[in-house]
Design a protein with these regions (language model features):
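Short, charged, amphipathic alpha-helical segments
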Residues: 42-47, 72, 76, 97-106
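Amphipathic, well-ordered alpha-helical segments in soluble domains
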Residues: 18-25, 51-58, 77-84, 108
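Mid-chain, well-packed structural core segment of small domains
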Residues: 63-88
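Amphipathic alpha-helical binding modules
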Residues: 81-126
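Short, solvent-exposed, charged loop/turn and helix-capping segments
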Residues: 51-72, 119
Length: 126
């Protein structure tokens, strides 16, 4: 494990927190849609998309911390997930949104999250 500057350590902790928050947000959106929807669902989903964009802005710093091919591939995969998220707004039906969440967005995000956490945990777990 490499030594990190305080700012780098803080960045990884915040990044890990955001990863968990996004998971919770996706779970909330899926539940709300399955339960008949909520006026807040589009707002929460937009917040998830905004969080993805915020995370994407930190990826250059993350890549510098973990100067490894595996992490670079995960960061590229993250960029592709943003495309799945944007497809949400193209779906006209609740059924289409549920299908998109269950078959593409949530599974790909959760798999990505587990892989990224393998890099993060040595630095963020005490």
């Amino acid at each position: 494990m490499k030594a990190l500057a305080e700012a780098q350590h803080y960045l990884l902790i915040q990044y890990d927190n955001l990863i968990h928050t996004i998971s919770e947000g996706l779970e909330y959106v899926e539940k709300q849609i399955c339960d008949g929807g909520s006026f807040r669902t589009p707002v929460v989903f937009q917040g998830i998309l905004d969080a993805f964009i915020q995370m994407n802005h930190t990826h250059e710093q993350i890549a510098d911390i973990f100067n490894e091919e595996g992490m670079h591939l995960l960061l590229e995969e993250f960029s592709r997930m943003i495309i799945h998220l944007q497809a949400w707004f193209d779906e006209d039906t609740e059924e289409g949104k549920i299908l998109l969440l269950r078959t593409r967005i949530i599974p790909s995000y959760e798999a990505w999250k587990l892989d990224v956490q393998r890099y993060l945990y040595p630095y963020v777990c005490h």
